Amino acid sequence: MLEAEKILITGVTGKIAFPIARALAEHNEVWGLARLRDPADRARLLDAGINPVAFDIGADDVAALPDDFTYVFHAAVDPGDGDWGRALTTNAERSGDLLYHCRAARGFVFCSTGSVYAYQGRRPLRESAPPGVPLRANYSFAKVAAEAVCTWVAKRHRIPLTIIRICSTYGPQGGVPADRLELMLAHKPIRLHPDRPNNYNPIYEDDYVELGIRAMEVAACPPIVVNWAGSETVSVEDYCAYMGELVGVEPIFEYTPDAHTPLWPDVTYMHEVLGRTKVGWRDGFRRMIAARHPEIPLT
């Protein structure tokens, strides 16, 4: 665990960045950047010991920020729901600007996504797998561009960088598995790709906090590019069936080629550079449900 460092966390109100910032704030000076349009977000950061900074990574000038951060975890993102040019500018160009501005840091983590990969069928995706354009095309190609920009900046200026390709996170803060739980509780269908089983490697909050911090510690030049996921593989079909057993609801699956293709990452390299995850998926899903729905008695 890092101690006595000055750390910048962007996108700090998000489900991934907030738990990491909260953990680091116990022994470090943590600055949390986000738009902070809701006063409740600022209060939540202050309660966690995080220094809140209202900042829009897509519009504000990074020159206004301090340049003496020792570590950076860059999770701010434009999801690409609107103009594709804006997504490209925010995710790629502004990330490069921030990386250069924080070039004195001993470790910089750029949050990419496993959705940069083209679907390869029912086999795990290694970091060398080719890119593709899944359903969220704007987001995916902007992240591919961002990886290229950040890699160039890091190599050019000898900045230690880790690019993590986030695959499937979940926990008390939420995540896609939590979204699927809500569909189950509402007795609504869960859309899945026909190429079943839909395999994933979900990573629980405790583990992604630990591996997120580890990613900052191992940052290097040339940059490390690594899948960021759980050590265990489980299909959506199996984990939804397990959640159904816990809450007493049968999942309804709707198979359609219009659904997201499965994202099944190869975690061999992750185990080498970041380590293995510790929370088994069954324990993690039970803990997620208990945290998000304490009113439901679990069987």
Regions found by a protein language model. Give the residues of each.
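NAD(P)-dependent short-chain dehydrogenase/reductase
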Residues: 151-200, 205-207, 243
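Conserved C-terminal active-site "lid" loop/helix of NAD(P)H-dependent oxidoreductases
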Residues: 205, 235-241, 255-287, 295-299
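Mid/C-terminal beta-alpha module of Rossmann-like enzyme folds, strongest
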Residues: 188, 211-214, 218-258, 266-267
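NAD(P)H-binding glycine-rich loop region in Rossmannoid oxidoreductase-like domains
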Residues: 39, 50-90
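N-terminal Rossmann NAD(P)H-binding glycine-rich loop of SDR-like oxidoreductase domains
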Residues: 2, 7-26
